[in-house]
Amino acid sequence: AAHAGADAILLIAAILDGPRLNDLLKVAYSVGLDALVEVHDRGDVEKALCYDVRMLGVNNRNLRTLETTLQTSFNLASELPKEITLVSESGIQTREDIERLRAAGFHAVLIGEELMKAEDEGKALKALLA
């Protein structure tokens, strides 16, 4: 990834065992990459926080049902360390969603579907950031 010009990699805690997650984090950091470790539930959080995670993303999309709810981020927020970068991923639709997530301790959001389904992505992004 670094050779291809990437700045970061995504590591999904649900599909990596602890030692493999740790190994991939070490390799990423050693070549100058950031790593966004994605979690979906408390078990993923517990696994991820055993290692040197600097950026943690809570995916609000259930990978089995594909249903999305911001409640996933809100439910996990109190268990997440505030000294690392916290990202809420998926299901963010409004400026109010962003504000509520920020109030819950998240530093960043990952927005995809909401922008992709907009007729004018630029206008939709401006509305989210206004």
Model-inferred region functions:
Residues 2, 25, 29, 49, ...:
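A structural alpha-helix within SAM-dependent methyltransferase catalytic domains
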Residues 2-4, 40-52, 88, 92-111, ...:
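Catalytic cores of alpha/beta
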Residues 3-19, 57-66, 106-125:
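Glycine-rich phosphate-binding active-site loops on the catalytic face of alpha/beta enzymes
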Residues 6-7, 31-33, 52-54, 82-84, ...:
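Short, well-ordered coil/turn segments that N-cap beta-strands
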Residues 16-26, 40-53, 63-84, 92-95:
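Short loop-to-alpha-helix "cap/lid" segments that border enzyme active sites
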Residues 30-41:
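Active-site glycine- and acidic-residue-rich loops that bind
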Residues 75-79, 102, 117-130:
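C-terminal helical cap(s) of enzyme catalytic domains, especially alpha/beta-barrels
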